[in-house]
């Protein structure tokens, strides 16, 4: 097997003592990895896409935790405030996933049954956005890794499939979960169908109303779907009593899904972002992208990714961050979040609950407060009060940058992208597209041939109501006041850790 390691590739062999990494000569790089390619640098001027064969798909996930200069803070038990152990997570997750959550191994083998399902759509293509570059009249080179070719139309099956696999292996009858825009819910419904598990989904009410066909997609794959807040849980009923038209939030939907899972021995909960094992599953995106950028003969100067809970961003960026830490490339890596839900750029780095009802372990992360309810922006998958603890920790180490962008600028960029590249993006990655366009315009001003990499983590075929709102002129940007943040932060526990 061959993997990118900075400027070259390494062959990996196994022995009794573990993994051996042997640098390959340039000619061997070509033969081992790219078949009939005759060079490792340069590309035909007309080349738009870079494709890997199925046998070149990575067979391991990458765990960045052991490579960091400092370990991330532990999750805390909500009752004792002591570091949470495996038994504290057992009511929610199977032990295999708990062990991945706390793993100190840099690489985890992908099970064969998971690889077989991955091959339905993986490896995914890397595109050079030549027509967008031309429209922008920029010397920049823009590359995007497209995850919209999966059955659910996004990157989410990269983790829903292994989560369903490990739960099925543990004898779980049903998985519960939350979803915002419906990308995660539909991905888990697809995965559960592959392994014969029931699936019950609480979808944020604002998105449930705005994106009805995602509900239908989930039901096609056998899932049961409820708007959140719902009258099925005590927490949901309390919120509806206060506001019958409550728009919901991902934090609320998580609380309802956890409330259904925790009391039952044969029911577990699946999370679509935030946690370490979820981000680790997504690193197959970045591992493939490293190989494909090598095919293109380019190394990114700037990597941008949309961030809500952090799974898409971590999946693309962590393998590149590994190479940066090893001194093999010098890439600026930037999180891009919605201006209406800016947990990194305006939130505090504090211990907080992952859900709104305070049922989960406390995690140290950038948060706007677990009771924060974002305005109903169209990027429903980014409406989460916190940021992945791992992404937050790496940001605190000074290894990442962050910016926030309003949704009208994002959709302006999405329209330009769709009219040049042909793909209608989901609302979530429009944030990364807008950031890439900003970088391309900077390159135009400076005359520098900046290489930009991003992930188009899903298509927007079921998000056309959002595009209709933009094209009709009814879409607005929301101003998040300091008072709104302060009010939500008032309920965050005060923990000296």
Which role fits each region the language model picked out?
Residues 47-172:
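Positively charged, low-complexity intrinsically disordered leader regions
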Residues 107-109, 239-277, 297, 322-330, ...:
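Active-site/ligand-binding loops adjacent to catalytic centers
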Residues 146-159, 175-184, 275-278, 304-309, ...:
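Active-site nucleophile and cofactor-binding loops and adjacent substrate-binding regions
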Residues 157-162, 177-195, 209-212, 307-317, ...:
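Short glycine/serine/threonine-rich phosphate/pyrophosphate-binding segments
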Residues 159, 170-206, 299-313, 333, ...:
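A short, small-residue-rich loop immediately preceding and capping a beta-strand
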Residues 162-172, 186-198, 219-220, 317-327, ...:
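Alpha-helix C-terminal capping segments
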Residues 184-247, 343-353, 464-472:
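Active-site-proximal loop->helix
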Residues 307-311, 315, 407-472:
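Claisen-condensing/thiolase-fold acyl-transfer catalytic domains that form or cleave C-C bonds
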